[in-house]
Amino acid sequence: MQFVTEPHRISAIDDNGKWVGDISFPPVAGYPDRVVAERVFVAPEGRGHGLAAELTKRFVDYAYERHLTVKLMCPYVKAAFRDHPEYQDLLLPEDRFNQ
């Protein structure tokens, strides 16, 4: 599996060169240091192998490396942030989950 990082998207490509999923995170208009975790999608043939979790982790690393603030829209990513208190500092204070 290869992962291709582009501005505002990380894609997963299988060993045959076929796209099998991605996470998209467009910028928030007027805030160059903010992105919206819009969606994670994994094609049916890629499901059941932890790919959504891997894409989410790579997104979190991307956000930390670039000092981004994250707004949560995708239910999957929102659940990941809720389950990982260590991600909370990527969120605005009013968006953080009470632990």
Regions found by a protein language model. Name each.
Residues M1-F3:
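Conserved N-terminal entry element of GNAT/NAT acetyltransferase domains
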Residues E6-S11, D15-P32:
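A conserved beta-strand-loop-helix scaffold within acyl/acetyltransferase catalytic domains
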Residues V40-R47:
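A short, internal acetyl-CoA/4′-phosphopantetheine-binding micro-motif in the GNAT/acyltransferase core
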Residues G48-V60:
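Conserved acetyl-CoA-binding loop-helix of GNAT-fold acetyltransferases
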Residues Y62-F97:
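C-terminal structural segments of small proteins and small subunits
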